[in-house]
């Protein structure tokens, strides 16, 4: 099973696709999301969101926001989000 992931910033869709795992920093600490995860609404803190797919990882830097999980769909909403070269990595 895979996760359907969408990462959006206030002004644009940053990334979307399938993933096997999502790891993010929340106000309650780091959280890992796998297929079948219980529904969740989390508050993100500034840091990295790692989206792992088959053979590749997408690393995004967010300034905070929200993470929603429901029925193997993960939606990450941030005021600003940058992926890869955009994030200064």
Predicted regions and their residues:
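Compact, glycine-rich, soluble single-domain proteins
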Residues: 2-89
């Amino acid at each position: 099973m895979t996760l359907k992931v969408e990462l959006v910033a206030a002004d644009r869709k940053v990334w979307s696709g399938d993933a096997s795992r999502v790891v993010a920093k929340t106000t309650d600490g780091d959280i890992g999301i796998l297929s079948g995860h219980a529904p969740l609404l989390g508050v993100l803190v500034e840091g990295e969101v790692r989206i792992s797919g088959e053979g590749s990882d997408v690393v995004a830097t967010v300034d905070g926001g929200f993470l929603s999980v429901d029925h193997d769909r993960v939606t990450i909403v941030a005021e600003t989000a940058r992926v890869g070269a955009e994030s200064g990595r």
